[in-house]
């Protein structure tokens, strides 16, 4: 898909082109001295994680990747990760610097270890950027005992300086673009506006991930892994053609490889499918790293820096996923987790009693417990809770159910695992649920709970913890073509 660079004010320019500023196929952010309405190349945002920028070998790989496609114009980088087994991530070393300072111990030698890592890269690649000035500035601030967020963020900051010089791109600090309010709450709209305004000045740029700033200028970080969020923010703000997330795996797998040997790769997954898989325990991108791209309808491509020819996994809208998956496996993936408790409440004429479920939720709220599912019948409702959230308070919760709900009986089923079979294609095939239940029965797995939404995006079954691996293998064998 081609895009147009819109020059000047996006509202007025879009009107002249008979476009809308909300239309994601159009980039409303560039200001170049080119002919008005000039059609140009699409824009991709590429984020490279810690393993992809860990050493000189990896940096040369990412340079080849970036230079192989001129559409890769905005690059977001993490701090360097581990180079080998037993090595330290730069971010971990920086947090250790903060701990050392808090214990009133000298931090200079430990911080020098961090600097030496960047200096070695600088020297071996023959770079020209003045890293010593950056080190000195950070050292000066360290003497004022800055926040842990500031110290941890310097890993991405220093790495982006190096990589910008290595690529010949501009360095653009995320500090001025990623916005938080005075209470540390992220400001999406302000961030999008700041990114568009700043990147309008840069044709090619490297941006450090992981952090932004508070209104007073102090550094504020996202949670660990926040560089994924920064990449999605840049892609969403400019309406990129694609957000490429480069890491050390070739996308997502249809099942946990620790359970299923050599599971197939997921080539296409919708945002909704990914959320279902993530919620049920699959190791995928955090929702916060998906949302900024999803609302702008920007596809996300998970790629492997070490195998750049592999197309990886595409995360797209539901409509696009259905188009791309024609002829693929019925299911997209299988995920699950163990250690849940099911509390089944029985009460005659429950369906006629107003506010029953509301009172259940009120009790859970009193104990700060989020329910996983609430499958129900005419006179029954089952509350599925994680043992971690129950935290040894099951007897107290049951007592509250009895006194405030007055059920006829309560059944408790402990040590339950939940398994979600996810896929938009399931709704288009008759007998999907029957096939799943048959596969589990033939494997000798007793189903203790079933929950299927009306959208038929997923089927969740509850099995005993001991049958968890066996159940996932059985479902995979039934649905995935060899």
What are these regions (language model features)?
Residues 9, 14-16, 21-23:
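Acidic, Ala/Val/Gly-enriched low-complexity intrinsically disordered segments
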Residues 311-482:
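A conserved regulatory-domain signal marking ACT and ACT-like small-molecule sensing domains
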Residues 43-44, 72-75, 149, 169-170, ...:
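Structural motif
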Residues 4, 23, 27, 31-285, ...:
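Nucleotide/pyrophosphate-binding catalytic subdomain
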